[in-house]
């Protein structure tokens, strides 16, 4: 028996009616033991994984916009740091303030830093 090429298979499919294609699909499901619900679950898994990744964010301080003192105070208060540590962190921009925190917490942290005058990015 000659090997069926991809091109000849596609060409044959083009000549079939919709009903014939549906019958072919059903026959393939039976022949290879394909469970359509398992395929749907497997296809949905990457989407759920991507959604999970979006639920945790990192807060990155991009710039102080000339309002370093206010931002140092905000960082000190929000992260419970000593004044010197907060100053070092703000002096070395861009700086990751917190990683892999819940999205709601990241948004709240960003709002307080923006209020102090900072440019903040959530990743």
Curated annotation (Swiss-Prot):
InterPro entries linked to this entry: Ribosomal_bL12, Ribosomal_bL12_C, Ribosomal_bL12_C/ClpS-like, Ribosomal_bL12_oligo, Ribosomal_bL12_oligo_N_sf
Functional note: Forms part of the ribosomal stalk which helps the ribosome interact with GTP-bound translation factors. Is thus essential for accurate translation.
Keywords associated with the record: Ribonucleoprotein, Ribosomal protein
GO MF: mRNA binding; structural constituent of ribosome
Entries under NCBIfam families matching the protein: L12
A single GO BP: translation
Family label: Belongs to the bacterial ribosomal protein bL12 family.
GO cellular component assignments: cytosolic large ribosomal subunit
Superkingdom of the organism of origin: Bacteria
Subunit organization: Homodimer. Part of the ribosomal stalk of the 50S ribosomal subunit. Forms a multimeric L10(L12)X complex, where L10 forms an elongated spine to which 2 to 4 L12 dimers bind in a sequential fashion. Binds GTP-bound translation factors.
Identification of the protein by name: Large ribosomal subunit protein bL12
């Amino acid at each position: 028996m000659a090997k069926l090429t991809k091109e000849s298979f596609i060409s044959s499919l083009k000549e079939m009616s919709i009903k014939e294609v549906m019958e072919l699909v059903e026959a393939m499901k039976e022949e290879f033991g394909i469970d359509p619900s398992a395929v749907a679950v497997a296809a949905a898994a990457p989407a759920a994984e991507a959604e999970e990744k979006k639920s945790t964010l990192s807060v990155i301080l991009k710039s102080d916009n000339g309002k370093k003192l206010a931002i140092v105070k905000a960082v000190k208060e929000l992260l419970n740091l000593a004044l010197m540590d907060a100053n070092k962190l703000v002096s070395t921009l861009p700086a990751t303030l917190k990683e892999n925190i819940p999205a709601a917490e990241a948004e709240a942290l960003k709002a307080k830093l923006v209020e102090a005058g900072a440019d903040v990015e959530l990743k």
